[in-house]
C-alpha cells in the first residue's frame, strides 16, 4: 500500500513537472516568435520600428527641412518653425525686394528662410509637403515617385519641370522603398493649409 502511494505521488509530481515545462516552453516560444517578428520589422525598415519612422529619418538626413520648413529668425540665426513643419513658402510672405534682372544675370538670391529662390530660371518657391489638400493631400504614392524620379511637378506626365534648388537629380537614386517611406511619413504629419505661389518665369522670358 505504501509503495502504491509513493508511486502515485511520483506520478503526480512528474505530470506537474511536464505541465510546467510545457507552459514555460510555450511562453518561451511565444517570446521568441514575438522577438523574431520585431526583428523582421526592424530589418525591413533598416532598424526603425515602422515605415513612417524610417521615412522621418530619411527626411531629416535628406535636409528637406532646409527649404520646405519656414524659419523663425532669432539672435542665433534661423530656426525651424515647428508649427509650419514642411509646409513650404508661406503664401502671405512678402517677395524678396531685388533687381531681378541683375540677379538673374549674375547669380541668385534667397529669402532668409530659404523658401524663395531667384535665379536664371526665374522665381521658385518651396512646395507644401504636408497632407493638406494644398500640399500632398491629393497625391498618390505613384505620383510622388514619378515626380522624384523624373523631375516633373506634381508627378503628372507633361507638367512643368521641377525647378532649382530642388535636388531631384540626386534624390532620383533613392530606392522605391525609401521613396515610399518618405511619402508615408509626409502623409502622417500635421496638415497645413498653405497655397504656395506658382513659380515666376525669368525676366528674359517675361520681357
Predicted region positions:
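Electrostatic cytochrome c docking/interface patches
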Residues: 34-60, 74-76, 138
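Gly/Gly-Pro-rich "capping" loops immediately C-terminal to redox-active cysteine motifs
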Residues: 73-146, 162-175, 205-207
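C-terminal capping alpha-helices of c-type cytochrome domains
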Residues: 138-153, 168-197
Amino acid at each position: 500500500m505504501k509503495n502504491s502511494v509513493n508511486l502515485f505521488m511520483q506520478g503526480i509530481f512528474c505530470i506537474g513537472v511536464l505541465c510546467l515545462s510545457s507552459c514555460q516552453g510555450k511562453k518561451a516560444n511565444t517570446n521568441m516568435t514575438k522577438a523574431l517578428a520585431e526583428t523582421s520589422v526592424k530589418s525591413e525598415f533598416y532598424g526603425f520600428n515602422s515605415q513612417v519612422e524610417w521615412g522621418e529619418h530619411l527626411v531629416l538626413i535628406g535636409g528637406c527641412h532646409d527649404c520646405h520648413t519656414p524659419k523663425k529668425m532669432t539672435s542665433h540665426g534661423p530656426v525651424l518653425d515647428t508649427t509650419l513643419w514642411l509646409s513650404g513658402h508661406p503664401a502671405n510672405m512678402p517677395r524678396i525686394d531685388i533687381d531681378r534682372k541683375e540677379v538673374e544675370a549674375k547669380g541668385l538670391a534667397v529669402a532668409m528662410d530659404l523658401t524663395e529662390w531667384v535665379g536664371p530660371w526665374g522665381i521658385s518657391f518651396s512646395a507644401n509637403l504636408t497632407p493638406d489638400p494644398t500640399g500632398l493631400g491629393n497625391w498618390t504614392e505613384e505620383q510622388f515617385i514619378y515626380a522624384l524620379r523624373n523631375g516633373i511637378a506634381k508627378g503628372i506626365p507633361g507638367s512643368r519641370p521641377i525647378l532649382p534648388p530642388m535636388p531631384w537629380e540626386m534624390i532620383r537614386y533613392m530606392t522605391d522603398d525609401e521613396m515610399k517611406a518618405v511619402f508615408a511619413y509626409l502623409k502622417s504629419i500635421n496638415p497645413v493649409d498653405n497655397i504656395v505661389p506658382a513659380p515666376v518665369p525669368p525676366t528674359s522670358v517675361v520681357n
